[in-house]
Amino acid sequence: MKLTYVPVKIARSITLLVTSPVESSLRAQTAGWLLRRAQEAEAVVFVEWDGDVPRLETAGGELSVDGAMALTAWLALDNGVPMGETWDFPLALNGGALSLPCAVTPVNTCCVVTVTMPRAEVTDFSPSDGLTLPLVRYPGIAYLIAPTGAVQRTAAADLLRQWSRQLSAPAVSLLFWNEGARSFDPLSWSKATGSAVWRRSCAGGAAAVGDWLRGRAGQSVSLNQPGGAMAVTLGEAGAVTVTAAAEVGSGRTVDLVF
């Protein structure tokens, strides 16, 4: 089976956007195969078409903000959006269960993409005696925020797998937060692929930290990650947007072999 995908780099984190059709029953296996084959990649998403309308699909129905940015940037270039012009449209995800308002502006060698997040649920998570972590939930994903020293990094992947069962989420990310530097290191776990991946950056994680900081930060905050900074805007009535630059690479075709 021939498989075509496009690598998209967002703050040095590479998402593979699969543009050829893949049956839903094969997406998890395909994503796992690509992550093993392209070791520089950190996430895999799929584009499906309902007539002329694109839709973002993920391996396990999880929310992928980086995937939304990748598809938005690719569509802008594929549709010839002029340099400096902003294109706004709602992007459907996972069978249309969710729609994310997206805006994209091609500039120089990249596209600046802004995604408006769904409303978050911000609570606490107490997986064991003596440990309580901030928890930010969006439809299809949960983010745990670990202040410096709260969780040992060497044990993080195993803990994340364990906690994901307690949280009953298709994807869970653990964000190692440094308050003084306003920075975090993201570790993402996916139930569909069964893998935990250290990320250079995570757009959804940036939005989650922004939601958590609401009331303690201004209307906008720049959050640093290993791959670079992302801008988060905190609007009224709980609105949150995250903005980052996306670099769309050349399409590649491989023979998919399980």
Residue locations for each model-derived region?
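A glycine-rich beta-to-alpha transition motif near the start of alpha/beta enzyme domains, typified by
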Residues: 1-110, 144-258
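Surface-exposed beta-loop interaction hotspot
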Residues: 107-157
